[in-house]
Swiss-Prot record:
This is Imidazole glycerol phosphate synthase subunit HisF. Belongs to the HisA/HisF family. It is found in: Cytoplasm. Its EC number is 4.3.2.10. It comes from the Bacteria. The active site is at D12, D131.
């Protein structure tokens, strides 16, 4: 039997506030991540991903406090990422109530950190986030490269090979964002999603580009992802998580 697939709403948080606007009806304060996460929990989300985009060090304490509040009110798995550089950072987040921790830039600069983290805490806690951009031209063999700093800095690393390396070091899951598609609302980059999903034995979460429910289903049916992540289609109340799950079930996808 096929493993059940997951829908994961994503919150971008800066200094304890959600920054990609959220326009749910009946939310008193659209900026409070705990209230928003609770709404997604009620709607039947399988997990929540919380990406801390605060640059400042003082923002970190706010983040830990927010994670503590969220973990006390939301009863689905919580992945937290952003600025995770040390084993102590991971320990702090797990102690605050995160179930999984996402490592992005630090993995590129110090791949062994992923292995160390997996040894300390177990692969099931360690997600490696990959930001990939297509670098091949028309007619060339498709190739995607890892970028850092919000898609601004190329690394020269091949995205598929890098994902395999991360799996080998002990990552339990890959969060794959297509920088070309992010925010475009015309669907995932199914090419890179499929290339990485097919190359790995661990789950791949597709991210970047969801504009409608068909895009979510495509990520799984055509991209072979294990889970799909979206922000704005849920934040702005265009669709609820229930509607997304119902649509995907109708397309024959076994949902959690």
């Amino acid at each position: 039997m096929a493993l059940a697939k997951r829908i994961i709403p994503c919150l971008d948080v800066d200094n304890g506030r959600v920054v990609k606007g959220v326009k749910f009806e009946n939310i008193r304060d659209a900026g409070d991540p705990v209230e928003i996460a609770r709404r997604y929990d009620e709607q039947g989300a399988d997990e929540i991903t919380f990406l801390d985009i605060t640059a400042s060090v003082d923002g970190r304490d706010t983040t830990l406090h927010t994670v503590e509040r969220m973990a006390s009110q939301v009863f689905i798995p919580l992945t937290v990422g952003g600025g995770v550089r040390t084993v102590q950072d991971i320990r702090n987040l797990l102690n605050a109530g995160a179930d999984k921790v996402s490592i992005n830039t630090a993995a590129v600069f110090n791949p062994e950190f992923v292995g160390e983290a997996a040894q300390h805490f177990g692969s099931q806690c360690i997600v490696v986030a990959i930001d990939a951009k297509k670098v091949s031209g028309p007619g060339e063999t498709p190739r995607w490269e890892i970028f850092t700093h919000g898609g601004r800095k190329p690394t020269g690393l091949d995205a598929v090979e890098w994902a395999k390396k991360m799996e080998g070091l002990g990552a339990g899951e890959i969060l794959l964002t297509s920088m070309d598609q992010d925010g475009m609302k015309n669907g995932f980059d199914l090419g890179v999603t499929r290339a990485i999903s097919d190359a790995l034995g661990i789950p791949v979460i597709a991210s970047g580009g969801v504009g409608n429910l068909q895009h979510l289903a495509d990520g799984i049916l055509e991209g072979h992802a294990s889970a799909v992540l979206a922000a704005s289609i849920f934040h702005f109340g265009e669709y609820t998580v229930q509607e997304a799950k119902a649509y995907m079930s109708k397309r024959g996808i076994v949902m959690r």
